Swiss-Prot record:
Protein name: Large ribosomal subunit protein uL14
GO CC terms of this entry: cytosolic large ribosomal subunit
SUPFAM superfamilies: Ribosomal protein L14 (SSF50193)
Role according to the record: Binds to 23S rRNA. Forms part of two intersubunit bridges in the 70S ribosome.
Gene expressing this chain: rplN
UniProt family annotation: Belongs to the universal ribosomal protein uL14 family.
Pfam family, one: Ribosomal_L14
Alphabetic keyword roster: Ribonucleoprotein, Ribosomal protein, RNA-binding, rRNA-binding
Signal peptide: none
The keyword Iron appears for this protein: no
GO molecular function, one term: large ribosomal subunit rRNA binding
InterPro entries associated with the record: Ribosomal_uL14 (IPR000218), Ribosomal_uL14_bac-type (IPR005745), Ribosomal_uL14_CS (IPR019972), Ribosomal_uL14_sf (IPR036853)
Keyword match rRNA-binding: yes
Species whose genome carries this gene: Petrotoga mobilis (strain DSM 10674 / SJ95)
Length: 122
């Protein structure tokens, strides 16, 4: 579960390291986001000499959450951290690699390119 002002790690090589959530997109007054949701974020930490700078506003897709996710078969899955992948206006990832595992729900919500870049899909 990710909400307003949450800090999340970046799971790709786009140049940002830490993001802060500004808004969870989708729905009227949606306050919490889970795996597969799109969020508007501010870059809090960035790698030097990249296109992304601190304070820049970007969009991202949540790929891992600490809060468990219940699946339709009754199983639960949770991860060690909250992480996201940066996307552009066409819902394509900004980076060329995705680090760490990615939940299967990301593919089901229409981000197949992110799931295909990930080494592990849980």
């Amino acid at each position: 579960m990710v909400q307003l002002e949450s800090k999340i790690r970046v799971a790709d090589n786009s140049g940002a390291k830490v993001l802060r959530v500004i808004k969870v997109l989708g729905g009227f007054h949606k306050s919490k986001g889970t795996v597969g949701d799109t969020v508007v974020c501010s870059v809090r930490e960035a790698i030097p000499h990249t296109d992304l700078k601190k304070g820049q506003v970007v969009q991202a897709v949540i790929v891992r959450t600490k809060k468990e996710i219940r699946r339709k078969d009754g199983t639960y899955i949770r991860f060690d951290d909250n992480a996201a992948v940066l996307i552009d206006k066409n819902k394509l990832p900004l980076g060329t690699r995705v680090f760490g595992p990615v939940a299967r729900e990301v593919r089901e919500k229409g981000y197949a390119k992110i799931a295909s870049l990930a080494k592990e899909v849980w």
